[in-house]
């Protein structure tokens, strides 16, 4: 007796079809599972056996072989419980053989209840691509799987519901599908709460408008973390494609919040400085996404940047340039998207008061230099904007007048991003920070005065080729915020102003030593 059931798996970020073949033959009772299952998959035999008996269904008193094809790809997780369950019953002709256009996913409880799984969205999209039209999933995963528009998704709370549906006794109702709409009003921290710090606020606005990286340097308590946490409130809304891509990553990692089928707000990730390189970039024996991939299309905030390990910080360099990261491990190889905005915050020295207007720094020049040099030149070079966050004067702190709100700043950011979307339509680029050298040359047109100013800055500041390109991208964003198609001297001057911290701190301490 033989049955085959369609299921799915996930490798990296992408789903793939899996055929669950069940063969019941003569011989002593035994259950064997082949096809590179991991320990969680192997354990499904006991869950399936208990579920079948507790639902008063027959368990074969003979040899049962289950094959998960393709057999050369390792299968992980408990999501194959339901298809194995269906396969055993279908092989005994207790229920009809499922059709090739039907697929099944779900973990079983011992009483036959269905429990949610990770990776429902990438697997649903893979099922749709493979020609599957009906997908049976645990009820908690139904809204997420229903994002795949060409699938009919059937939510089930128990394997008994699936049996009755296949037997034609009681049909399951398809999951409702709601159209994609905007995230709505921002309910998180607002820029109106911030007192003073006009330069830092402007830097965050420019960073949001162009998708640029930003480094904030200042003494403790001046609002660096407060400012960073308000950055998502001024970022443009995600498109449907961006929302799906972001949700796929969180779903595959098992981090999608319960009851949230699609992430609509841009992600803000803030890992602790004790995080390992594998935790930051991704890893494990079987590759899993790390913080830089979980921050895709959003913000990665690294507070107390010099406290991170050197390998962790240096691992950011390639993803910041390429927007993807490839992880190779014994359990496989996976490529994850990692197009994120990096926001770093740090003190200027170990005690935090180097250069403070009123408090004396207790660090020696050697300590200051060693502390600052934890940030390597190549990583500092990738910070498009560098801004100082000084102490706020009392008059500004006590000012009761409301500051500019996030909604007002966001309107300007949205207008600048709309200009960029129209300009780069059909190129695959969505913001200025992702401009390729060819597009940079084509779209970053300088006035003669701006060109002379940039040439002087290039020589005087000793900019690298990468720094030059990044400065030009920032100037392009500032011009977009001003509604100017050409980049003028004022736009270049402001972009240069946001590249001065390395001269103030890193180069000065090096000379003093």
Residue locations for each model-derived region?
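Peripheral, non-AAA+ core regions of ATP-driven protein-machinery
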Residues: 1-215, 219-225, 467-468, 485-513
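Short beta-strand elements
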Residues: 18-24, 280, 384-387
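Hydrophobic anchor at the beta1->P-loop junction of P-loop NTPases
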Residues: 33, 216, 231, 302, ...
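Basic, amphipathic alpha-helical bundle interface domains used for macromolecular binding and assembly
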Residues: 34-45, 60, 67-77, 286-287, ...
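P-loop NTPase nucleotide-binding/switch module
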Residues: 168-206, 210, 237-292
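Walker A/P-loop
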Residues: 215-257, 322
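Walker B catalytic acidic pair
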Residues: 297, 303-304, 315
